[in-house]
A protein has these predicted regions:
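Mature hydrolase/peptidase catalytic cores and their serpin-fold inhibitory cores, especially
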Residues: 265, 274-278
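Short, hydrophobic/aromatic alpha-helical segments in well-folded domains
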Residues: 23, 51-55, 82, 147, ...
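Glycine-rich, charged/polar anion/phosphate-binding loops
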Residues: 52-54, 108-114, 171-175, 276-277
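Alpha-helical scaffold elements lining the catalytic groove of polysaccharide deacetylases
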Residues: 44-52
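M16 family metallopeptidases and their MPP-like homologs
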Residues: 1-10, 14-45, 63-71, 122-139, ...
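Active/ligand-binding-proximal structured segments within catalytic/core domains
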Residues: 127, 137-155
Length: 301
């Protein structure tokens, strides 16, 4: 494994776009040991193969503290002996997991990061917003994120593509986690001609501002998004992977009950336009933005 890692490092050829993305990552959060580049020199001088297994066992070798999620179409009494045999064969003892990585610091002011490093004739624009705190239940937050994402994308497509005709598509992504530290991140992205970048960015913020000022303006889109979320929910929950994921996330995030699952449809239906407007205002207008623009390389380059 070490030899392959060294060979991979020595043969990889990073493009200018790769370097752009690395610098952008370092802007989004302060770099530390968790994301430093592992060079061939580091592997040769600092990594010892005989350390790997003891280090793993030190942190993860014992079964204490693990949560096992088992799904089956068989009655519990039929599979219980097999479960007990498996659990009984796991190593005992205590793992050392006191250390918790705190996560990198995020920008507290808006940043503009632009570079002529792209191979495409179009510019790639990303507007990235981050918050380092989570208010309330993360499941409620993620539901608001899903609703806001769907509505915002519809509104941006209507303006940037249908009205202005300057983009083919618009991407809107949202996410939140409590571990290893609280982080919420929202991204709006699109590709366009370099000369259209600023006009599209200005229009994006205008759309966001109008949504916050007039929640009734997206009531139709809100109902469409709600309908689609409930429809997708009914389909997805037929899969076993859905339940293992929901159980894992509930336990992992220390959610005290299962209402985010049992009351999902009611929770979706209860979200109002004002709720969405307040959420968008907090995430997109009251948060510093990292404006990252990957421009085409100059012809002379």
């Amino acid at each position: 494994v070490m030899d392959k890692s060294i060979e991979k490092y020595r043969t990889i050829r990073k493009t200018d776009a790769d370097l752009f993305n690395t610098e952008l990552r370092n802007i989004l959060r302060t770099p530390d040991y968790t994301d430093r580049e592992i060079s061939d020199t580091i592997i040769e001088n600092e990594v010892k193969a005989e350390w790997l297994l003891p280090a793993y066992n030190h942190c993860f070798g014992a079964a204490e503290g693990y949560t096992f999620i088992i799904t089956s179409d068989q009655p519990l009494q039929d599979i219980e002996p097999f479960i007990e045999t498996y659990l009984g064969g796991l190593p005992g003892g205590k793992s050392c997991t006191e250390y918790v990585h705190k996560g990198g610091k995020i920008p507290v002011e808006s940043v503009v990061f632009s570079r002529k490093a792209g191979d495409s004739p179009k510019a790639v624009v990303s507007l990235i917003f981050q918050q380092d705190s989570i208010d309330g239940n993360i499941m409620d937050l993620n539901l608001k994120n899903d609703v806001a994402k769907g509505i915002l994308r519809m509104k941006l497509l209507a303006v940037l593509r249908e009205k202005m005709g300057m983009v083919y598509s618009v991407g809107v992504s949202v996410g939140a986690t409590q571990h290893p530290s609280a982080l919420c991140r929202e991204t709006i992205s699109f590709s366009c001609l370099p000369d259209n970048v600023q006009a599209l960015v200005d229009s994006t913020f205008l759309v966001i501002g109008n949504m916050c000022d007039d929640p009734d303006s997206f009531s139709g889109e809100l109902e469409d998004v709600k309908t689609n979320l409930i429809k997708d929910w009914k389909i997805t929950k037929q899969r076993s992977s859905f339940w293992t994921t929901q159980i894992r996330n509930t336990l992992y995030n220390n959610i005290p009950d299962w209402k985010h699952i049992t009351d999902y449809e009611a929770r979706v239906k209860n979200i109002t336009s004002e709720d969405v407007a307040d959420h968008i205002r907090k995430c997109f207008l009251k948060t510093p933005v990292v404006k990252a623009v990957l421009l085409p390389k100059d012809d002379k380059e």
